[in-house]
Amino acid sequence: MEQLHMYWKNEGQTVPEYKLPEGYTVKKITEVPDGVEQWLEIISHGLVDGVRDKAFYQRVMVEEKGFDPEYCFLVMCGDEAVATLDILLYTWRNDGHLHMVGCKENHRGKGLATALNLLALKTIQELGFATASLTTDDQRIPAIKSYYKVGFQPDLSTQDYVERWAKINAIIGR
């Protein structure tokens, strides 16, 4: 099944500053000595199935159009990376695309994804992009709630999308 799409328009609105719970910080993957290894561990918690290695990181990140490691963020709890979000810079369409957003199970429900989403929108706005976009799966209800919370809107461009979003919105009471 094709992933769902969501969009955010940069209309000069104020994007709130992100706030992390006490004990958490954000670093760029380039600032963490074993950042790639820690990123691989995070994404194994619900984003991908099976063992992943540096070749996987190379394929889904480094070789991805618009990838810049300066925009790959890790939420740290001490020396442990517990959540991640990457912004792909789609300059050809004036868009910042949220990519590989994930969090370890034992750190979910603490607002880390919302903080990362706000950081991404603020960054995208500061870079001057007109829009932000993302793709997600129907069953990722907590993630979808977080995307709605920061202002993303669903793509309703096809009847299939309309029907799928109606089911999701019924589940979350929207």
Segments (PLM) and residue ranges:
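Acyl-donor-binding surface of acyltransferase catalytic domains
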Residues: 1-23, 28
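Long, contiguous binding/interaction regions
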Residues: 7, 13-17, 89, 96, ...
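A short beta-loop-alpha structural element at the N-terminal edge
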Residues: 25-39
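A conserved beta-strand-loop-helix scaffold within acyl/acetyltransferase catalytic domains
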Residues: 44-103
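Conserved acetyl-CoA-binding loop-helix of GNAT-fold acetyltransferases
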Residues: 100-103, 109-122, 126, 145-149
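Conserved GNAT acetyl-CoA-binding A-motif
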Residues: 124-136
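Conserved beta-strand-loop-alpha-helix junction that forms the acyl-donor binding cleft
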Residues: 134-144, 160-166
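Conserved acetyl-CoA-binding loop of GNAT-fold acetyltransferases
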Residues: 148-157
